[in-house]
Amino acid sequence: MSAKDPSRGLLVSPIKNGTVIDHITAGEALNVLRILGITGSTRECLSIATNVESKRMGKKDIVKIENRELRTEEVDRIALLAPQAKINIIRNYKVVEKKGVEIPEVIRGVVRCPNPGCITNTDEPVASTFEVLDKGLHCLYCDWLIKDDIANHII
């Protein structure tokens, strides 16, 4: 319970080991799970909180994944959806590492190009490569620009 507001306790229990993804853009928690390949049939024990009040963001989502630490490419995917997200690595109930996500300048093999004629969508063994711009994601093979709904293009 908080000393300032006794009506506010912990929304979900702490985890012993794993990852807490905090400050996810409100409404994006389920997309974060999807791009991490976490479904209802996977083995991870999850805690999800959506539209939680946040002084800094107004509203935010939080995801706790027990017994799993994220790989760099997974963190890069999260950065595309939630650029303000914080990744907390938990070991024995303690935060041992806390870092913000960084959107890379170039992403490879993370996003599928929506252009059906792009070489990355053929049988050629070519990984998609996008330059990250303020206005969206620019395919370096076919010059296609993804401006909206990036979550649906993440592999």
From Swiss-Prot:
Zn(2+) binds at C113, C118, C139, C142. Binds 1 zinc ion per subunit. SUPFAM superfamilies: Aspartate carbamoyltransferase, Regulatory-chain, C-terminal domain (SSF57825), Aspartate carbamoyltransferase, Regulatory-chain, N-terminal domain (SSF54893). GO terms for biological process: 'de novo' pyrimidine nucleobase biosynthetic process; pyrimidine nucleotide biosynthetic process. Its cofactor is Zn(2+). It comes from the Archaea. Gene3D superfamilies: Aspartate carbamoyltransferase regulatory subunit, C-terminal domain, Aspartate carbamoyltransferase regulatory subunit, N-terminal domain. GO terms for molecular function: metal ion binding. InterPro entries: Asp_carbamoyltransf_reg_N, Asp_carbamoylTrfase_reg, Asp_carbamoyltrfase_reg_C, Asp_carbatrfase_reg_C_sf, Asp_carbatrfase_reg_N_sf. Signal peptide: none annotated. It holds the Pfam family PyrI. GO terms for cellular component: aspartate carbamoyltransferase complex. Belongs to the PyrI family. Involved in allosteric regulation of aspartate carbamoyltransferase. This is Aspartate carbamoyltransferase regulatory chain. The lineage of its organism: Archaea, Methanobacteriati, Methanobacteriota, Stenosarchaea group, Methanomicrobia. The gene is pyrI.
